């Protein structure tokens, strides 16, 4: 059967106390709405409709994609009214209704829910709670069949004792939806059009109301304030940490790892505490990552080592290479096999060949280094003249003395050496020694300045 999905994302989220629409607040570095959309896409629907209201322009701008149809709910008059805004666009056999502030919903749960939908049967997602205060209750008859959903504010004292609650997630036969939504009333405590009222209508029309429950109740936990956002963030991170450990990663403290993207890992990887992985990160076998590191959109080849307090973005570390402690590798940085950058070294769009080393206190930008080069402490590639950037190219086996300024554009040939303290402005041929500093002078009988007596 064909499927369309409606995601409700129009709410203001006043309890977040934020100018940012609630559905754009992040979980694991991604907007909550983005998590829901990604899960919805896995179901391969005909189309995904996103109902927007508060901050509509910003939500549309941030989440724009060819497979999304944004539908405006100008007034927030309830969930039933929100779904009704999408009715003109719906024609599928099944319609699944999701929520933009319920970011941890899982594919398996939705597949089980949809499997129960037929032309004469709808399915809703429920969960049992010890404290169901504030949630709509699932009312069943003596045979256990679902009869209705009663919102907390409208529930009787007896109904408020029910522990099974409505998550809001619902899958219905598409051809029935327009009729049910057209019959909704706002005669209730909140003066809103409740989507949940379609359950009683379906029962009255002779349909069967099936139900399913998630394997993990946190899947259907919504976010209404910063505390709930933090709770879901930690739960999400715990799940990702467990997933990594099942794949052969040693986490020295699973509670002190943050994963904010798509991570591919090999075996026998070790990750120390307070590590943040963002974007697309590939970690091959036997990689070690030290504490307090941030790694974004990078590739770490087999046996690479990232030492403490290092920051990598858009970088690639070759097999057996190492970086840090306190190294910064910016986009376009590549370390060849067994290359090394040490403490307080910054690379930007720079490639170090196999076995090359920059031990400490250096900046290498827009540079290409051959194999087995040695970069002395305090070396800087002067790659920017205030208007344009230029490259520095070193051959193999180049030795750069300490405290050098390499003024680009510049080429240094194989086996060349530069003296400590040099400013190199012209090409250095292979195997040459280049000096670029003032000659030392010694003044005899020099007397140090003395303090002026007051």
From Swiss-Prot:
- Cellular component terms (Gene Ontology): cytoplasm; membrane
**Which residues does UniProt assign to the signal peptide?**
none
The UniProt record gives the binding positions of acetyl-CoA as: 377, 383-384, 402, 420, 437
Q: What Pfam families does the annotation carry? A: Hexapep (PF00132), NTP_transf_3 (PF12804)
Classification via InterPro entries:
Bifunctional_GlmU, GlmU-like, GlmU_C_LbH, Hexapep, MobA-like_NTP_Trfase, Nucleotide-diphossugar_trans, Trimer_LpxA-like_sf
Q: Which reaction does it catalyse?
A: alpha-D-glucosamine 1-phosphate + acetyl-CoA = N-acetyl-alpha-D-glucosamine 1-phosphate + CoA + H(+); N-acetyl-alpha-D-glucosamine 1-phosphate + UTP + H(+) = UDP-N-acetyl-alpha-D-glucosamine + diphosphate
Q: What keyword terms does UniProt attach to this protein?
A: Acyltransferase, Cell shape, Cell wall biogenesis/degradation, Cytoplasm, Magnesium, Metal-binding, Multifunctional enzyme, Nucleotidyltransferase, Peptidoglycan synthesis, Repeat, Transferase
Subunit info here reads: Homotrimer.
Q: Which HAMAP family match?
A: GlmU
- Record's function text: Catalyzes the last two sequential reactions in the de novo biosynthetic pathway for UDP-N-acetylglucosamine (UDP-GlcNAc). The C-terminal domain catalyzes the transfer of acetyl group from acetyl coenzyme A to glucosamine-1-phosphate (GlcN-1-P) to produce N-acetylglucosamine-1-phosphate (GlcNAc-1-P), which is converted into UDP-GlcNAc by the transfer of uridine 5-monophosphate (from uridine 5-triphosphate), a reaction catalyzed by the N-terminal domain.
- The protein in question is named Bifunctional protein GlmU
Q: Which organism is it from?
A: Pseudomonas aeruginosa (strain LESB58)
